[in-house]
């Protein structure tokens, strides 16, 4: 209803203004006939005097954000901001280095796997694989055992009638040692990481051989004392 009343009022005002303009035009024509000089000046004045009716405009503006004045930060805040920037840059550099190292590690692993596979293929193409470290160790143990048995036989031949018994005991102890087994102690190494158990096996074999030597020496010393007492 209020909008309708406002529209009616504006229409009434326009009609009244149009009527006034028509009356002014009639007066201008009449005055122009009597006073021709004042005609254009009067029309200019009337054009400047014309005004349209103003309407009330409602500004539908909501409560906007409260803007604060931008101030320069304090020196303490500036120091904190600089420290935060340096920490961010350092963390970014560290993360980049870590990513690069991980990528290089994966590349190295892939390259080593490819090399190992190529070596295996070449060995299969050539025929029988070369002797591994475990096989070499077993051969060395057998050679040491043969040398010990030969030396013991010589000593037993020189010592007298009890040589056969001592020889039999030494053979039994030699056969009980792990060096006499034909199976390898360690599986053939496929990469450099398998060398550690091979070294541990070698050390174990050395300890066992030392114990065997001590036992043989003890038996020999006991047999010598017995033979001397009997003589």
From Swiss-Prot:
One GO cellular component term noted in the UniProt record for this chain: nucleoplasm
Gene name per UniProt: Pimreg
Compartments in which it is found: Nucleus; Nucleus, Nucleolus
Keywords: Cell cycle, Cell division, Mitosis, Nucleus, Phosphoprotein, Repeat, Ubl conjugation
Protein name per the record: Protein PIMREG
Organism ancestry: Eukaryota, Metazoa, Chordata, Craniata, Vertebrata
GO BP field: cell division
Stretches with biased composition (Polar residues): 178-190
Main function: During mitosis, may play a role in the metaphase-to-anaphase transition.
PANTHER family: PICALM INTERACTING MITOTIC REGULATOR PIMREG (PTHR35819), PROTEIN PIMREG (PTHR35819:SF1)
Quaternary structure (record): Interacts with PICALM; this interaction may target PICALM to the nucleus. During mitosis, associates with HDAC2 and MTA2 subunits of the chromatin-remodeling NuRD complex; this association is strongest at prometaphase and decreases as the cell progresses through metaphase and anaphase.
């Amino acid at each position: 209803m209020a909008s309708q009343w406002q529209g009616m009022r504006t229409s009434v005002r326009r009609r009244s203004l149009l009527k006034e303009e028509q009356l002014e035009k009639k007066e201008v024509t009449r005055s122009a006939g009597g006073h021709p000089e004042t005609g254009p000046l009067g029309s200019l004045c009337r054009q400047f005097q014309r005004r349209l009716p103003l309407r009330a405009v409602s500004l539908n503006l909501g409560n906007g954000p409260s803007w604060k004045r931008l101030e320069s930060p304090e020196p303490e805040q500036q120091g904190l901001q600089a420290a935060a920037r340096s920490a961010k840059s350092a963390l970014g550099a560290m993360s980049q280095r870590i990513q690069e190292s991980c990528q290089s590690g994966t590349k190295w692993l892939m390259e080593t796997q490819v090399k190992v596979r190529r070596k295996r293929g070449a060995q299969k193409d050539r025929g029988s694989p070369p002797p591994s470290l475990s096989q070499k160790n077993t051969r060395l143990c057998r050679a040491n055992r043969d040398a010990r048995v030969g030396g013991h036989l010589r000593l037993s031949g020189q010592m007298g009638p009890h040589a056969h018994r001592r020889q039999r005991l030494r053979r039994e102890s030699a056969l009980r040692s792990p060096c006499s087994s034909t199976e390898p102690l360690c599986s053939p190494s496929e990469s450099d990481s398998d060398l550690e158990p091979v070294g541990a096996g070698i050390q174990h074999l050395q300890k066992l051989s030392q114990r065997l030597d001590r036992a043989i020496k003890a038996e020999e010393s006991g047999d010598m004392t017995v033979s001397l007492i009997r003589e």
